[in-house]
């Protein structure tokens, strides 16, 4: 018969199993360090926004950050999660749904974020409920907009069954649940945060970039022209390796005159981002554009092997040449670098990927790129997680 100490040690190892009614081998929730995503660029500004949302989360169990693409919803949510994780007994864990295309895979993707399998005889949602139970946990659920019904059903079930769970979501629109509090993410402050972000990202590609009386005015005008949209500012700042702020502003003004003329009225934030992507894309070299278009076949994250597999084409450049061009796309903010569970990963932001997919379709090489993509997925070491989706045209 096991000693009392042994029984206590086993019980402590499975804090989510209570009263003898949960499956005895229900796994323990993973630690914070194993369930979080880390960006490799610094988080800039948003002090007031961070304080506002933190205050909301102290009182509400479901808060949704809304706003158009490129406004920084994901970065804000992850930063808030990092700041308040210590307030939750079992920390926080993140689930990015950007790559999930099947509503039935949402709960499975959440288990994947925890690094947990579905328990035998239980559905994915029942496994989640059993794992979380009455533990105090923060769930950051990112990119819910294309799976609103599925997310609503799962979130409702989790909140009803897990009384100490708090959920922070991001979406272009509200989830639509009773008790949900929506908070629209604003543009960056044009007097401080937007300029600070531009300078920070400019120094990633040009370490000697300096702000003085002259450049401060121009950079401020660039940020104003871009309506304080973070992604648009990052794309523009990445051009300081070859263009001066004055040249960047002139190029943006030319592009926005076309957009405003077509719209017939003021340019919306969505149009601001689209125009900035188009302008920055036009400044890429031919091989860089070709590689970007090919990378768009990845609906979610990928690694360097994947980039080489789909990017290399004997007719224009080979696999070893892909790395240099890939590095240029990272420097120019077209490819996002993330540290996920200690491993470097890459992805395209939604608006960039959608534009690149259009260009890939126009190029006439979509079928060939898709063939290389499928061949890569069949390699022995490639594992496609549930819900990773496919190519979405």
Swiss-Prot record:
Which keywords appear in this protein's UniProt record, sorted alphabetically? ATP-binding, Nucleotide-binding
Q: What residues does ATP bind to?
A: 67-74
Q: Which GO terms describe its molecular function?
A: ATP binding
The cross-references to SUPFAM superfamilies, in alphabetical order and at most eight, read: P-loop containing nucleoside triphosphate hydrolases (SSF52540)
GO CC annotation terms, alphabetical = cytosol
Q: Which InterPro entries match?
A: P-loop_NTPase (IPR027417)
Q: What else is known?
A: Was identified as a high-confidence drug target.
**UniProt-recorded name of the protein:** Uncharacterized protein Rv0894
Name the source organism: Mycobacterium tuberculosis (strain ATCC 25618 / H37Rv)
């Amino acid at each position: 018969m096991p000693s009392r100490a042994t029984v206590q040690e086993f019980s402590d190892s499975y804090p989510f199993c209570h009263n003898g009614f949960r499956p005895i081998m229900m796994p323990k929730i993973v630690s914070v360090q194993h369930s979080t995503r880390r960006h490799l660029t610094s988080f800039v500004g948003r002090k007031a926004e961070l304080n506002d949302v933190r205050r909301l989360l102290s009182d509400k169990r479901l808060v949704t950050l809304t706003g158009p693409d490129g406004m920084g919803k994901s970065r804000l949510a992850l930063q808030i999660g990092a700041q308040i994780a210590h307030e939750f007994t079992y920390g926080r864990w993140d689930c990015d749904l950007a790559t999930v295309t099947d509503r039935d895979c949402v709960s499975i993707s959440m288990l994947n974020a925890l690094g947990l399998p579905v328990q035998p005889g239980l559905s994915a949602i029942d496994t989640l409920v059993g794992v979380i139970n009455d533990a105090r946990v923060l769930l950051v659920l990112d990119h819910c907009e294309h799976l609103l019904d599925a997310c609503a059903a799962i979130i409702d079930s989790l909140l009803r069954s897990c009384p100490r769970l708090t959920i922070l979501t991001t979406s272009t629109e509200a989830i639509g649940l009773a008790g949900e509090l929506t908070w629209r993410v604003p543009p960056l402050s044009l007097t401080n945060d937007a300029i600070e972000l531009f300078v920070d990202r400019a120094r990633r590609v040009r370490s000697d970039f300096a702000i003085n009386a002259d450049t401060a005015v121009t950079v401020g005008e660039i940020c104003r022209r871009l309506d304080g949209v973070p992604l648009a500012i990052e794309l523009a700042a990445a051009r300081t390796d070859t263009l001066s702020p004055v040249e960047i502003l002139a190029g943006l003004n030319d592009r926005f005159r076309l957009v405003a003329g077509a719209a017939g009225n003021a340019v919306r934030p969505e149009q601001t981002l689209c125009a900035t992507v188009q302008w920055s894309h036009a400044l890429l070299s031919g091989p860089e554009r070709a590689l970007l278009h090919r990378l768009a076949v990845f609906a979610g994250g990928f690694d360097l092997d994947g980039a080489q597999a789909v990017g290399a084409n004997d007719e224009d450049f080979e696999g070893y040449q892909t790395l240099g061009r890939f590095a240029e796309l990272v420097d120019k903010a077209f490819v996002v670098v993330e540290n996920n569970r200690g491993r470097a990963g890459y992805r395209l932001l939604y608006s960039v990927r959608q534009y690149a997919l259009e260009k890939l379709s126009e190029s006439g090489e979509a079928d060939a790129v898709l063939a290389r993509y499928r061949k890569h997925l069949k390699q022995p070491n490639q594992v496609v997680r549930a819900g990773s989706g496919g190519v979405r045209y």
